[in-house]
Amino acid sequence: MYKFVLSILLVATMGIFAGCTKYKDQKKAVSGFAKVYCDESFKNILEQEISIFEYQYPHSNVMARYMSESAALDSLLNKNVDLIITQKDLTQDQKRYLASKNRAYRSRMIAVDAVALIVNKNSDIDELSMQELTDLMTGKYRTWGKIVPTKLRNDSVKLLFDGNASGVIHYMKEKFLKGKDFSFPVYSAKSTEEVFQLVEKNRNAIGFVGVSWIADDMGESAKSNEERFKQLNKSEQETEPTAIDFTSRVKVLKVRSMDRVQGVKPYQAYIADGSYPLFRKIYAIDAAYPGSPSHQFFVFLTGVIGQKIILQTGVMPGAEPVRIVDVSN
């Protein structure tokens, strides 16, 4: 088994920590109520970001709403919210629309996420190729036995997604169906947690979830906000590496690219070098006024600590370089 140990390489800059007095003043300056709309598949990460942000800046409060990607984008354009997290950057038409309304915006890739394939932990299926996935997604074959050698032979394949308008299902449709709808019924769960529950109960099911939902952070979640903040705030020389394994609730499948003889699981190293083929970029899009609470949270997400939090969830940070160390057991 392989565990990948990653740590962020931070460029030391003068004046970051200028003293306790300045830091206390900064804590008071960053205050107020921020609002962010986000795709459900990124919820696990955003909740951790909010928890540390509110600990660091106790006079701040962030309200997150989780919805479909299209609903979040519409809300930004209609000025119902000024900060969203989505897997798509703004189109040229959307940029022109914001400009016509005199709304300045900032867009930053904050992460490279991956879509993980999960099956019942007692399943004898370990790997799917991109061609086999294509056959599943297009409905060419509807029973497991026609896809891979398995004891499930005549069992129908049950595809499970975290909602019919989520970023995950949009990504898979664009990847395999050129954006078209499925030609057969698929199951849209009410949440990512329900996808896990259904996979645990149904041996013929295969679920599609954001990779942060399968990551076992090796004890990070058990730490208090104070402990996590102290660790996140360490200099490069003191930064502890992050060891990521996967949850034992389900089996995480390997995925094999067309040009490879062996599949890989969505470890950060394989996401980073492109070996794991089901990866997607995640963007934070901020149209808030500079200095406003929503903009301050955007700055946090794209800064050093925000990127370290992303690293600890099994996802690749988008704004900071990382060092990857392969540790074999």
Residue ranges and their predicted role:
Residues 7-16:
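Bacterial N-terminal signal peptides
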Residues 85-108, 243, 250-251, 257-262, ...:
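Acidic, polar ligand-binding/catalytic clefts
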Residues 96-105, 112, 223-235:
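A short, gly/pro- and small-residue-rich
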Residues 110-113, 278-280:
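Short, solvent-exposed loop/turn segments at the edges of secondary structure
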Residues 70-101, 214-217:
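Pocket-flanking alpha-helical
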